[in-house]
Amino acid sequence: MPTINQLIAQPREVQKSRKKVPALQQSPQKRGVCTRVYTTTPKKPNSALRKVAKVRLTNGFEVIGYIPGEGHNLQEHSVVMIRGGRVKDLPGVRYHILRGVLDTQGVKNRKQRRSKYGAKRPK
């Protein structure tokens, strides 16, 4: 426990809160180019092949983004838009790729929650 004189000489430092999505730099979304599109496996109790992409953003950051929905058309050099939002069972994946924006197509045959997956209204 410091003395009052010690605290006057050197005050306590305020702890800075860590940002959850630093690569966005306070923006709601950022644009980037896919450098690698691949699948990865989730943490212990779950089992799947999750689709992810390594994305180089316009601000120079390189991040891993999750590709939601069934099926996708992404490949290397695809231009994508990312938003914040982690995937709980994939360590290091702190961003989501937006479907139906730029080079990413929406999910086919999607009937419910279409706006989340960039799907047009079925006729």
UniProtKB/Swiss-Prot annotation:
Cellular component aspect of the GO annotation: ribosome; small ribosomal subunit
GO molecular function: rRNA binding; structural constituent of ribosome; tRNA binding
UniProt cross-references to SUPFAM superfamilies, sorted A to Z: Nucleic acid-binding proteins
Pfam family, one: Ribosom_S12_S23
Keyword match Thylakoid: no
Coiled-coil zones: none
3-methylthioaspartic acid PTM positions: 89
HAMAP family: Ribosomal_uS12_B
Subunit annotation: Part of the 30S ribosomal subunit. Contacts proteins S8 and S17. May interact with IF1 in the 30S initiation complex.
Record protein name field: Small ribosomal subunit protein uS12
Organism: Bradyrhizobium diazoefficiens (strain JCM 10833 / BCRC 13528 / IAM 13628 / NBRC 14792 / USDA 110)
